[in-house]
Amino acid sequence: MNNTNTNTNNKNLASSSASVIFSKYINNNNNKLIPFKIKNSDLGRTRYFPPISKEWKNSIYVFNHNNLKNLPLFDININSLIKDYFNLQFKDKILFKKKRLSKVKVVSLNKIYASKAEIKHTNTKAILTVYTFNREKISLYKKIKKLKKSFYFVFDKIISFSERVILSGVPIRVDKDGKVLSNLYLPFRLRGVLPWITESHVNIWRKIIIASLYKELILLRKYKLRLDLNKYKFEEKLLYRLNNLIMKYYNKKVEFNIVNMRSFLLNSDILTKILALKLKNRNARVIKIMDVILNKANLPKINRVQEKASLIKSVDWNLLENKFKNLNLSFILNDASYAERNNLSELLNKLYYNVLLVSQKGVWALRSPKGEQPSFHSKSGGSPTKFIQKGAGAASLGGNAKAQPKVSSFAKAKKYAKIYQIIFNSINYKNMGGLRLEIKGRLTKRYRADRSLFKVKWKGGLKNLDSSYKGLSSVNMRGYAKPNVEYSIFTSKRRIGAFAVKGWVSGK
């Protein structure tokens, strides 16, 4: 009995001493007991991961590493093939009476510029993405417009001359070359001369028109031939030949994605090529050319103070992860209303693709809840239903806006608008943020290396707004390259020596 009492007393002393030590520890550390509560998640949006093609020009995975050794050489050969393909022209005998100098062909800026190919490999095919700027097409259309004005000018002269001849009553004599031998002049124009026109007059006028517009017609034929060749370069009629040549390198099928750009400023490869070609001219002024290119860059007009302001950290309740504690579908259905439970597609559509139709300054646009970017808009005004109905007609009837769309096509247009906007808003760095140009090398008329130039000019900025100002994390490519900046370098030479052009294009 004595032993059992002593054991119980020892246990009581140990427990009391432990409780005293625990209470002293709590009082000394000033810790408070926190009851168990369910804490809501405060996750932020996931970081934007740029496409892998912007990091590596070749995206490939192979089991045998020896297959990768030839890829750098293949890239050089394929890029030169693509460049030569887009520089294809007719023989000089077809378009010109005498042979053109090769220097004129190289220095000419009116051609199709192509960037370096971005190649994605699969087991069965290689997908080549090439960005192009079709300067030749723009210049040819401008020349045709000038010809159109000259046509009208010559026709006015012929009509006024024919009116004078008909009024005089003297027969018109035309030689073999179509030149009119009778030279009459009257100081006024006669209107309503159609009753006097005969078949002989029509034949004579045809000869006069052909003789007077001979040069213009020959030029028009040349421009038409060049336009047709320019068009066929982007079609399967000629692309299959380039396809067959590239297939010999990779021993698999080749697929092309050709992106025709509206401005050469949107791609750094094309930008540096054009700048280097302009600097090949000995009389070119370096600073002036750089200013001309930078002035063509249209940066969005945004309040710089608001754009660079740091974000206030707060919980984004629009995210699905923060709306629900559990992302299981059964848990979401229990919290939903009875009507939404029966229609699962409407519930998911409401949760993920909540697109609002907003009217802003007479322009109906489909926008996200934050109003980040419009998917498409109509400046003609009208109600939003008419706007979507027009899109439904275009989507269902191949762009025939006159046909009346059915109810199903109206619903398809709404879904199409949502999908379009979701994809469009998920892409970052769509707007141009800035440009930077560097030129270095022998760009003076002196045969001295110490007279080489180094010029730098920029417009806008190259910094990533998320990581530099807003305090958000961003993904770096290859450890040092910024995801919002595209960089390229192009080397060229003059009679005196070589020079290089560097270009940076940033997005935001």
Swiss-Prot record:
Keyword Transferase appears in the UniProt entry: no
Transmembrane spans: none
Subcellular location: Mitochondrion
Keywords, sorted A to Z: Mitochondrion, Ribonucleoprotein, Ribosomal protein
GO cellular component terms, A-Z: mitochondrion; ribonucleoprotein complex; ribosome
Chief place of localization: mitochondrion
Entry's family note: Belongs to the universal ribosomal protein uS3 family.
Subunit and interaction comment: Component of the mitochondrial small ribosomal subunit (mt-SSU). Mature N.crassa 74S mitochondrial ribosomes consist of a small (37S) and a large (54S) subunit. The 37S small subunit contains a 16S ribosomal RNA (16S mt-rRNA) and 32 different proteins. The 54S large subunit contains a 23S rRNA (23S mt-rRNA) and 42 different proteins. uS3m, uS4m and uS5m form the narrow entry site of the mRNA channel.
Its job: Component of the mitochondrial ribosome (mitoribosome), a dedicated translation machinery responsible for the synthesis of mitochondrial genome-encoded proteins, including at least some of the essential transmembrane subunits of the mitochondrial respiratory chain. The mitoribosomes are attached to the mitochondrial inner membrane and translation products are cotranslationally integrated into the membrane. uS3m is essential for mitochondrial protein synthesis and required for the maturation of small ribosomal subunits.
Stated name of the protein: Small ribosomal subunit protein uS3m
Source organism: Neurospora crassa (strain ATCC 24698 / 74-OR23-1A / CBS 708.71 / DSM 1257 / FGSC 987)
Gene that encodes the chain: var1
